[in-house]
């Protein structure tokens, strides 16, 4: 009597090998057959029939879509429900609309409000009013950016992010605080800027600190609107390394070359001399001076070149004076050079 033995795989991609009609198996053949069956079972564990896969995908998509639908409905309810007081819901301009449309319109109005909050400064006046006499109000306001003007961010694998202090920062702040109201106005977050300024200015030369929340968001870029400063713009100087941060007031900006962290930088010392000349000459409208230097790629280098040429011209004029008058003019020359024409 013959015994029919079936062996194959459940995997349809492989298919059945077929059937074999054999006699009774020997012990060795039984061992081989059992081994083959175990191998087939192990291969079939990860196999999912197409119908089962479709069911799994259906449930996955259903859960995702259901979650998204729940979130959207919750947002419509939370942002679109009417305000209430002790007497119940308060009527507004959407109260006469159909119920569902009321919620949609209120939600849209709320989202526009939050978008406007993000794009505009938090306050219409970023600085308090100038102090009245007998208190002393500096004649000019100096608005500074932090990044690449006073410090430079540096990252290494060993230390992570660090900020390198620019050469001459202490001297610059100390000298400018005599004639300028120093204001930090940066697009950096407050959690970054405030600890950095605490370490950078231990003596309190910086009077006010304005961070990202005080900027305007225009086409994805944080800009500085000087109209909110509550200061006379004819006496406001903005020092930055990005010409696009003050698009509404380019004549108030002195755009320096970006500091990249080099130790031989002397630009803050040159800037100190430039600002001291403005204060010493009591310039009525700083925008005229800044407009002139805005045409140069490196305004501080042009300023130094102008000062050298002025000094040479002054020395030539002194040499042409009679000997009796030279000593008297040399004394005035020292003062006139320190207070020489800025241009």
Swiss-Prot record:
The name this protein goes by in its record: Mitochondrial import inner membrane translocase subunit TIM50-A
Mitochondrial matrix side: 1-57
InterPro entries: FCP1_dom, HAD-like_sf, HAD_sf, TIM50
Annotated family: Belongs to the TIM50 family.
PANTHER family from the UniProt entry: DULLARD PROTEIN PHOSPHATASE
Subunit annotation: Component of the TIM23 complex at least composed of Tim23, Tim17 (Tim17a1, Tim17a2 or Tim17b1) and a Tim50.
Function, as annotated: Essential component of the TIM23 complex, a complex that mediates the translocation of transit peptide-containing proteins across the mitochondrial inner membrane.
Main location (coarse class): mitochondrion
Source organism per UniProt: Drosophila melanogaster (Fruit fly)
Mitochondrial intermembrane face of the membrane: 78-343
A Pfam family that the UniProt record links to this protein: NIF
GO molecular function, one term: protein tyrosine phosphatase activity
Lipid bilayer topology: Single-pass membrane protein
Subcellular location: Mitochondrion inner membrane
